[in-house]
UniProtKB/Swiss-Prot annotation:
The UniProt record lists the keyword Zinc: no
Chain spans, region Disordered: 1-53
Membrane-spanning ranges: 66-86
Domain of life, source organism: Eukaryota
Protein name per the record: C-type lectin domain family 2 member L
UniProt-listed PROSITE patterns: C_TYPE_LECTIN_1, C_TYPE_LECTIN_2
Membrane topology note: Single-pass membrane protein
PANTHER family: C-TYPE LECTIN DOMAIN FAMILY 2 MEMBER L
GO MF term list: carbohydrate binding
Keyword terms, alphabetized: Disulfide bond, Lectin, Membrane, Phosphoprotein, Transmembrane, Transmembrane helix
S-S bonds: C125-C205, C184-C197
SUPFAM superfamilies: C-type lectin-like (SSF56436)
Length: 211
């Protein structure tokens, strides 16, 4: 009787091949790094990074244009106002007094050359937005004395028994004294004198200086 045969030995499977080690990552170029960075992601994702920048630039440009437009409108309005003022004669405000007028204190004075009666002199002053001179202080009177070579009319006249200035103020006899018995007053080099209003002589206008 033949002996029992042993079953053949099973062949062992070959061991699995070793996996190759992963390759080292390739260094990124600056362009790739920028593309993978936050700004690149924003550009790729369409979140509007570049759009946001251009939007801000557009907004700033619009704001600048609006500001320049407002400045242009303001300058135009100023020119219009200046033109209106100039047409009304306010261009004279550039100097304290009109031409041929003399500045003293806060007043402008006009000393006429031609002789006229008191009322004519008063009317002349009125047409030049002034009045026959009203003297309000001793210093003003002393200033007037310096320009009285031709003894001009001033804005002082008798009303009844008392003298009054043309602006309605009463005359103060304690401040000034008046010689003569006439109705209208003129200035001599050292005093005030009253005489007939129809007498012809130069006159002095006064008004407030431009400020």
């Amino acid at each position: 009787m033949e002996p029992a045969r042993e079953p053949p030995a099973r062949a062992r499977p070959p061991p699995p091949a070793a996996r190759p080690a992963p390759a080292a990552p390739r260094p990124r170029s600056p362009a790739e790094a920028e593309a993978r960075g936050p700004e690149g992601l924003l550009r790729r994702s369409g979140s509007g990074y570049e759009g946001s920048t251009s939007w801000k630039a557009a907004l700033e440009d619009t704001t600048t244009r609006l500001l320049l437009g407002a400045i242009a409108v303001l300058l135009f309005a100023i020119l219009v106002v200046m033109s209106i003022l100039a047409s009304k004669g306010c261009i004279k405000c550039e100097t304290p007094c009109p031409e041929d007028w003399l500045l003293y204190g806060r007043k402008c004075y006009y000393f006429s050359e031609e002789p006229r009666d008191w009322n004519t002199g008063r009317q002349y002053c009125h047409t030049h937005e002034a009045a026959l001179a009203v003297i309000q202080s001793q210093k003003e009177l002393e200033f007037m004395f310096k320009f009285t070579r031709r003894e001009p009319w001033i804005g002082l006249r008798r009303v009844g028994d008392d003298f009054h200035w043309v602006n309605g103020d009463p005359f103060d006899p304690d401040t000034f004294t008046i010689s003569g018995m006439g109705e209208c007053v003129f200035v001599e080099p050292t005093r005030l004198v009253s005489t007939e209003c129809l007498t012809t002589r130069p006159w002095v206008c006064s008004k407030m200086a431009y400020t």
